[in-house]
A protein has these predicted regions:
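Ligand/cofactor-recognition surfaces for anionic moieties
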Residues: 1-836
Length: 836
């Protein structure tokens, strides 16, 4: 577990792909010996890569697998990628590189790919696909022959879950033989097919949602991949992201008989992946044998203000400029009415009486709020793989990369008084191209005017802008994909949010993750300490006293962006600090004395995603040790960590637990899903309202589902990691230790460090932050306060209420005409983005 930095992170940094366990040390004589099936898998992959290198492009067969997401019989998409247009661009590029393929028109391509999805939703659609040459047959005998080569335990598990393969609804009978039907669109030697659903529709919804812990994919899932391996020389998993790398099995160092590798076999996998999701891209590397080809996020622009907010901003400035009197009073009435109409008063967490009691204070808050909305990075539509954004959006992205110092300097250079420079981008969203910062970029970046006569700071910014603008060209994406299809090495790069980390571009490179041994970095530690104090202050302001217990949701994708700032918050709340070696690697933690801390410790429960568990076991070890140290500081009268640890230990001893086991359980603070499993189960369960009757039963079943899925403990003793319950208290009276530790949670914290992914972009914030809130309400009868550690901008990060954060997201996206029009221009793919 602790060797992830050495065996995985460092080789991935160098560009090594498909790292497999091929040998082991024999206990009897300490000799390194090959593990035959594993070593064979490495050899087979090397042979297939060599074949890609030697086969002319015109002779290569390539399969492209797309995702049926969001669920629905007409839906195909990927995260912030226009899939139909991207497929067409890739097909054009493959043709130009000598591949035997054609490129249908966009509407025809969408219609044909939608036909391929129909059998997953409706009976009687297999024969029409076969008649239209939109499917092929895989003899069931071929699948059985493959199945019989697997270990007996694997065969038994598959048959126990799904019965005999012949029972699959994707099987047809012809000429006395059974065949799996594989929907596919054949364009020359390129095959495009949907990734098969994990389920075959034979398991009851109640069992699948509430009781399944392993969720083995169906016979049909494996059959589709078997057919793909037989037909194709390489496989493209198209966009972020599919299901194969999330199948059950070990976190890393998988066996070839674990479901993720069982599906893939040894076929080379190219995986175009969004640059701002390094964590899940790493999952595709380690569990999907993939070479990642990074692609851009959508371009961005400062959101600006829509008409109602522009009017509000104008009223605000009128009020500030007016002398006391009737006109100013009338303006104040109009401004408050406008703010109420747009629900901005509520968004600021205020009431009308509070506004009236301190109108000048309200104006200051409103002014800051409108500036933040106008300057917020707003995604502009979707990205098309291999295509550069249009000039307006490209320059808008560069503007955001350069940030407030450039905006102010550009405005002052254009003659704006310094006291008004911060208004440079605060105006109607349609007029971005008329602003001074944008026009300066256009002249010196696009038109190439010299910068020699400009102030030195502007010269430096514009040189950076020229590089950033060039890097937004996206030329490397198609080049990178074609290189992988040639079996070639692909240069590496770090990814992340391009606004915060412009070095994530140019794209078309093989993404690697952050070295987990450096979490938190010393910079993240200093920022995290301040963020922790900000969190305490925010809670005091809202609730009148400091929190005693908080629960944090830890995400791999977030940690790879903020380098451990959220972990630093948790450590400082506990009153523990990291110890680094000379190279910046964390080697341990130590307790901060109470007098040095200057306040009581805060008890912290840590709920980790499955991906975090996989990628950061060494960080979990340090966090577990930190919780233990804080729980052992029993001489502090105001230490809730020690108090809660002792309370839980005593409860467990009273129920019959061994005192040492009880003490370990009391000191445990980290929980996640079972090893090899991912998610909370809430994403599917909330849509299955037909499995409960009434809100009370629904809340109870959802909370119990969440607690059962996320109860696996990662405490001070690594040997006991990943276990549910408490040793000695198994059976009917088994203890859910996670539930015991969640009781009394006063606040739950999630970080947001991406300018692209917000609270509503995916269901993950709902699953994890919402799951904590749901569980605590179930346990305590009262939901905790929900906080967002907003790490999008520079500095230590702000702590905001989730409601306020969500309100700003709605104002700059779902309720903003610029965002809506951007998606409308994407056609079919934009509609799916709204649906998602």
């Amino acid at each position: 577990l602790m060797d992830v930095p050495f065996y995985l992170a460092q080789p991935e940094y160098a560009g090594v792909t498909d790292i497999q366990v091929a040998a082991a040390t024999r206990k009897s004589d300490e000799q390194i010996v090959a593990i035959a099936p594993q070593a064979q898998a490495v050899v087979n992959k090397a042979v297939r890569l060599a074949k890609l290198q030697s086969t002319p492009n015109a002779d290569k067969q390539v399969a492209v697998m797309f995702w049926n997401y969001p669920p629905g019989e007409k839906n195909l998409s990927a995260s912030f990628l226009n899939v139909p247009r991207s497929l067409r661009h890739v097909l054009d590029g493959m043709q130009a590189a000598g591949y035997d393929t054609t490129t249908p028109q966009e509407d025809a391509l969408i219609e044909q790919l939608q036909h391929l999805l129909a059998p997953a939703y409706r009976a009687g659609r297999l024969q029409p696909l076969l008649q239209a040459n939109l499917a092929e047959l895989l003899p069931l005998a071929d699948y059985r022959a493959w199945l019989t080569q697997l270990p007996e335990a694997t065969q038994a598990a598959l048959n126990a879950a799904w019965g005999d393969p012949a029972q699959s609804r994707m099987v047809v009978r012809r000429g006395g033989q059974d065949f799996f039907v594989i929907p596919r669109l054949q364009l020359g030697k390129v095959l495009i097919l949907p990734q098969p659903p994990r389920s075959d529709g034979q398991v009851s919804k109640e069992k699948a949602i509430y009781h399944s812990t392993t969720a083995l994919p169906s016979h049909y899932y494996f059959a589709t991949y078997l057919w793909t391996r037989q037909r194709a020389d390489a496989l493209i998993h198209f966009g972020t992201h599919g299901t194969q790398e999330w199948l059950p099995g070990k976190e890393r160092g998988l066996s070839v008989y674990d479901p993720p590798l069982l599906a893939l076999g040894d076929i080379p996998v190219a995986y175009p992946y969004i640059a701002d999701n390094i964590g899940e891209a790493t999952q595709a590397k380690r569990r999907g044998r993939a070479t990642i080809i990074s692609h851009q996020t959508p371009p961005f622009a400062p959101g600006g203000l829509h008409a109602a907010l522009t009017h509000m901003h104008d009223l605000l400035h009128q009020w500030l400029a007016q002398d006391e009197g009737a006109v100013k009073e009338r303006t104040a009435i109009d401004l408050l009415a406008a703010a109420q109409k747009e629900r901005v008063v509520a968004d600021l967490g205020l009431t009308v009486p509070q506004v009236q009691a301190d109108f000048a204070g309200f104006v200051r808050q409103l002014h800051d709020h409108l500036h933040e909305l106008a300057q917020t990075a707003q995604p502009q539509g979707l990205h098309t793989f291999g295509q550069a954004p249009e000039e307006l959006h490209r320059l808008g992205t560069v503007l955001l990369m350069l940030g407030q110092p450039f905006w102010d300097a550009a405005a002052i250079h254009a003659g704006v008084p310094p006291e008004d420079a911060d208004e440079a981008l605060v105006g109607p969203w349609e007029q971005l191209a008329q602003t001074a910062p944008y026009q300066l970029l256009q002249r010196h970046v696009v038109q190439g005017e010299p910068v020699d006569d400009l102030p030195e700071a502007l010269q430096k910014s514009l040189q950076q802008a020229r590089t950033a603008y060039a890097n937004l060209g996206a030329q490397g994406e198609l080049t990178g994909l074609l290189a992988v299809l040639d079996g070639k090495y692909l240069p590496t790069s770090y990814g992340g949010d391009p606004i915060k980390n412009p070095d994530a571009y140019p794209t078309g490179r093989n993404l690697y993750g952050f070295d987990p041994s450096r979490v938190p970095t010393q910079q993240a530690w200093e920022a995290g300490k301040q963020a922790a104090e900000n969190l305490i202050a925010e809670h005091i302001q809202l609730h009148g006293k400091a929190p005693e217990k908080l629960t944090f949701s830890l995400w791999s994708v977030e940690t790879m962006r903020h380098f451990g700032l959220l972990e630093a918050q948790a450590l400082w709340l506990l009153g523990v600090e990291p110890v680094w070696d000379a190279g910046g690697r964390v080697t341990g933690v130590r307790l901060v004395p109470r007098e040095q801390l200057g306040r009581p410790r805060v008890d912290v429960v840590l709920s980790a995603t499955g991906l975090y568990r996989d990628h950061f076991p060494n960080v979990m070890k340090q966090l577990a040790q930190a919780a233990l140290l804080a729980s052992q500081a029993r001489d502090e009268a105001d230490n809730p960590v020690a108090r809660n640890a002792q309370r839980i230990a005593q409860q467990l001893i009273a129920q019959g637990a061994d005192p040492e086991v009880a003490a370990q359980a009391g000191a445990t603070r980290i929980f996640a899903s079972a090893s090899g499993n991912y998610g909370t189960g809430l994403d599917d369960a909330v849509l299955a309202s037909d499995t409960w009757s009434g809100k009370e039963e629904g809340d109870r079943k959802l909370a119990q589902l969440y607690l059962s899925k996320m109860q696996y403990a990662y405490g001070p003793d690594e040997k006991q990691w990943g276990q549910a319950g408490v040793a000695g208290l198994e059976g009917r009276q088994g203890v859910n230790l996670y539930a015991e530790h969640l009781k009394g949670t006063q606040g739950a914290v999630l970080s947001r460090s991406s300018n692209l992914y917000g609270m509503l972009t995916t269901d993950d914030p709902f699953q994890y932050l919402g799951g904590i809130a749901l569980a605590v309400r179930h346990l305590d009868g009262k939901a905790p306060a929900l906080y967002i550690s907003n790490l999008r901008g520079a500095g230590s990060g702000r702590v905001e209420g989730a409601a306020q954060f969500l309100a700003k997201e709605l104002a700059t996206r779902q309720f903003h005409p610029g965002y809506i029009q951007g998606l409308m221009q994407e056609g079919y793919a934009g509609t799916l983005q709204v649906l998602d």
